[in-house]
Amino acid sequence: MLSATQPVSENLPAHGCRHVAIIMDGNGRWAKKQGKIRAFGHKAGAKSVRRAVSFAANNGIDALTLYAFSSENWNRPAQEVSALMELFVWALDSEVKSLHRHNVRLRIIGDISRFNSRLQERIRKSEALTAHNTGLTLNIAANYGGRWDIVQGVRQLAELVQAGVLRPDQIDEERLGQQICMHELAPVDLVIRTGGEHRISNFLLWQIAYAELYFTDVLWPDFDEQDFEGALHAFANRERRFGGTEPGDDKA
């Protein structure tokens, strides 16, 4: 899956991007263009996941978060959902050993309780196998929604208040942030969305507060290393203000 000898691109600037999140959109449209069913597009998209993980691991990125299955995706046709679940199992079985060999830590974020027991067991084993790896952290968002993430964090704080461990006046952004998925990782710097749509679709609502957004018309199965590099070039050329103003600009 990963190439240990793949060089860092000579054209890639010192991008300073530690955490990239990707909304992998366009599998269905890609399949339609090929005259195939949507499941064919999802399988083709898995190849793009391999490319993205390899590129991130070899180009100075600490964490890569991929939006694989949203909590709203259960509303898709049952046949497509079933195919996605089987693809998830297949990907874990076929890729996790390669991830482990290349020092990648795999984590699944989202509510996995709705998945069948076979998939839940695969997830637990995959996370356990790679838990102590120190290279790229690969987060797969599955049955994930940004609103769900915030709600589950609030519930955890409510339980602490109910238990008398925490007072309501002690709750602040930092305290809530500690209950949100990936709180121990660097904040998301860049969100990439493929497929031409310009929205975030309930993805990492808390974590992307100050992230840069990059939209491309490229469908996910066609997204390659050059496209990833282009996104990092765009990121490197942006000025991040984090709510402030441009240096030396005193105008409102």
UniProtKB/Swiss-Prot annotation:
The active site is at residues 25, 73. PROSITE patterns: UPP_SYNTHASE. It catalyses: 8 isopentenyl diphosphate + (2E,6E)-farnesyl diphosphate = di-trans,octa-cis-undecaprenyl diphosphate + 8 diphosphate. GO terms for biological process: cell wall organization; peptidoglycan biosynthetic process; polyprenol biosynthetic process; regulation of cell shape. InterPro entries: UPP_synth-like (IPR001441), UPP_synth-like_CS (IPR018520), UPP_synth-like_sf (IPR036424). Its EC number is 2.5.1.31. The keyword Cell wall biogenesis/degradation applies. Catalyzes the sequential condensation of isopentenyl diphosphate (IPP) with (2E,6E)-farnesyl diphosphate (E,E-FPP) to yield (2Z,6Z,10Z,14Z,18Z,22Z,26Z,30Z,34E,38E)-undecaprenyl diphosphate (di-trans,octa-cis-UPP). UPP is the precursor of glycosyl carrier lipid in the biosynthesis of bacterial cell wall polysaccharide components such as peptidoglycan and lipopolysaccharide. Belongs to the UPP synthase family. This is Ditrans,polycis-undecaprenyl-diphosphate synthase ((2E,6E)-farnesyl-diphosphate specific).
